[in-house]
Amino acid sequence: KLLCVRGNCDAEVDQMVLEFPVLADYAVLPVGRRLIYATHGHIYHVKNLPPLAPGDVLLHGHTHVPAWTEFGQGNLYLNPGSVSIPKENSPHSYMTLEENTMQWKELESSAVFHELTL
């Protein structure tokens, strides 16, 4: 399943040419005992948090830099990086979720460069 949220450069015209929803400001996914709050990151981010409970996950890609850090009360901040415009010498990358395992992968080779079990 593909999950998309609106980015800071996305507009209604983008939705008109796609067959799946891309304009939500956020999505919430239950994974095990955690909730993943997925958003682009230009509205909600680590300095302006959405309503997270202890242990919940903030997932956003606005910075275009892969990241995985713990903060708050067992919360996690995850960033898949960017497939198109990576920053800070990071690889072109994306993230997958299978069961309760997140994997960061390089776009060209699909090689896993980080893995995290929630």
Q: Which sequence ranges carry the predicted segments?
A:
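Short N-terminal helix-initiation segments at or just after the protein's N-terminus
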Residues: 22, 39-45, 114-116
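Active-site neighborhood of phospho(di)ester-bond hydrolases with catalytic His/Asp-centered motifs
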Residues: 2-8, 37-40, 57-62, 78-80
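Binuclear metal-dependent phosphoesterase catalytic core
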Residues: 25-32, 71-72, 77-118
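Core catalytic region of metal-dependent phosphoesterases/phosphodiesterases
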Residues: 1-31
